[in-house]
Amino acid sequence: MKTPSLRSKLKPHLWFQAYWVIYLIWFFWLDLTIKNPKYIIHSPIDDLIPFNEWFIFPYCSWFVLLAAVTAMLWWYDTESYDKLCLMMFSGMTLCLIIYMILPNGLDIRPTAEAIGRDNLAVWIMQLIWKADASVNVCPSIHCQSSGCMALAFSQSKLAKHRPALKAVAWVWAGLICLSTVFTKQHSILDVVCGLVLVAVWVPFLYGKKTKIAD
């Protein structure tokens, strides 16, 4: 049996990544047009979570997780790759629709004076805050996509009979979700809503396979 060529793998599956063009245009259009969100997302739990600038590093590691999981599943397990794209892109699309219908934002970001510290992590945080307005936050796309990546990878052929890899995927995704609230990029409500968008796919895509993968 011949090993599938790069061209044969590119043709049926990689075109899913064209969605990113649509997503980025749509996302930044919303970011530029929604300046005064109608709904402010807040929970009393948010007030109990301290700001910690060092969580900006797991927050930014989302890009590494996205690239790594997408590439590995595309190359080694196209069935899981297709499921990842279905879960993640449909969820991201729903999030953008919600932002349009229910424009929402946050008011929990601390000022530089309130932080009272000057270090690399704070500097990175301030750069992100300048570029990323505190609007379009619920559900959290950061958390929704992280959950999809952990789920798809942990149920893939790559993680089958490799509990350590499953643990790494879930711990990494968990740290990313935690980072969103410790950096005040999101409310805990955003996180919960984002993860709900992941959970709804489990019975449809993994109801039977979960037993096999374990």
In which residue ranges do the predicted regions lie?
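Interfacial helix-loop-helix junctions of multi-pass membrane proteins
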Residues: 113, 133-138, 175-202
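Membrane-interface loops
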Residues: 31-44, 74-164, 212
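Hydrophobic alpha-helical transmembrane segments
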Residues: 56-72, 89, 93, 145
